[in-house]
């Protein structure tokens, strides 16, 4: 028997997602840009999927851009906000020290282009406050980008409060919601979110497909040049089967969110309680404001990779950091950000 405990890295695709994808592969296989009937059936499925995602986020369908995943969505959001800022002479960007590398590496690129990036320090419980954001905003701030929930330690950030600060100050607010979508309630209107990224494979949808919410009126920079797909904002024939699967998975996750939260949170707390009894162990991240399915601990004197191999031999699949850095021997930037020693 295998115990899969690596759902922050990716999730098993649900039957709901598979059932939505198969007709798109077998029947509605046309190019959605084609005018013939097969193409238009694909276009209709694309439209319905866009409406489904928009419903789950409480936005308009025209505000959803489909992408290849969360990293592309993050890149497009940040580069677009930077372009707006450059035109206005505002070259200051605020983020946090424990963002996903899709954010941090894009910010490094923007620094080389002349932007000043300010990474807010993270409290030892893995939290950043709205007050920190408010105190950091300047006259030349063009963007605040703060993740909805951390992918390693599971901390849930006060997104609504941060969004309210940004809206009051007139600063664009982007959140990487890759770990939150399908697991936490998202309402881009109530939470004052201008741009939001998500990825299908984090909530039992397919890999290689994601979405970017962009509030109406915000101009986007094209990260991929080519055709006029996605209203000219993301070139390339749309991955209709993947998009259909992602939309179905998100709708299903949102419909069962509360019952899943109660069940998974109970399992999480039971596991944390048991593992915390191991000598020289410590839980990372906030215990109250935490993703339902996240458990992250440090064991003093234990090398992470060796522990993972032993767990795998025992039939337990887990990770010692984010999947995007699994080939690196560098210490987790997230754990360093909250003050954990190497």
What residue spans do the PLM features occupy?
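Pyridoxal 5′-phosphate
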Residues: 1-342
